[in-house]
Amino acid sequence: MNKTIISVAALSCLAATMQAQKKAAAQRPNIVYIMCDDHAFQCISAYGHAIGKLAPTPNIDRIAERGMRFDKAFVENSLSTPSRACLMTGLYSHQNGQRQLGEGIDTSRTFFTELLQDAGYQTAIIGKWHMGCDPKGFDYYHIYNDQGQYWNPQYRGTDTPEGKYIVEEGYSTDLSTDHAIDFMNHRDKSKPFCLMLHHKAPHRNWQANIKYLGKYDNVNFPMPETFYDDYATRGEAVRTQKMSVTKHMRWEQDFKVPEMLDLNNEDSKDSYNALMGEINRMTPAQRSAWGRYYFPRNRKLLEANLKGKELDNWKYQAYIRDYMSVIASVAESVGRVLAYLDR
């Protein structure tokens, strides 16, 4: 009799504890933070820019419609890794140690995910980390090697043997989304969670998923008013940046025209080798599909022998079409995450 009472009492206490945990979790919202790398606001159709109207992103727009659209928000640092460091610490770059690429974040600083853990959250990060240290304040992580690769990226994390990097076949945006949904499926349901899904996309050099190659070939995107701006009257920072489509983007790697290789030019050879490194990562099927799109396009370019502003326009269209095709995968990923959360 006593044993039964004790057992019932224990079960009652356990049930009460579980109910209290569920109630507490319900009062603390789950957090899903999706971060892209070099994603211009003009390319999110919720902002009403001409580019967004021609290449709409309805899944991303749903977030703006359901919540808040930030029109006057600015990053503390516009570089990828330093920007993430500001996010993780809530501190300016000169305070968190990550002022530019190549520097390491001050890991003695508190990451906001550590505070969430203290508040009972289960935390996870998937995709791009690139901070020069192991993720801190995360119960689960599955991160790229370095800044990651678009095709068949390497991941390591709390679920890989001995923390070693493992190549996973597929497109990085899709794979990271798969892992994010898998985490949400298998998380501790008694706790609220914070999931950070960090994409490589749409970082340079804009390698689109095979299914989106050519998606915008029939779209003529308007060239920005500043396309030919030399920034002569602007500040030193903007004047000295290498951000011109016509002057600084490279034929081989950026425009994906390996036929332009100049064996007498070191920059051309470096650009070609960088592109070949990406192509050689692909499976035979991926490589074949890539070639079926780019090689005919490149032949037309070489035959046309464009000059002057016609060539400038070709470069801009090639760039922005690849860029928006990469964003198409990001928008698809957002849609998948929202569909999961809506279930």
Model-assigned labels for residue ranges:
Residues 2-4, 9-13, 18-343:
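Formylglycine-dependent sulfatase
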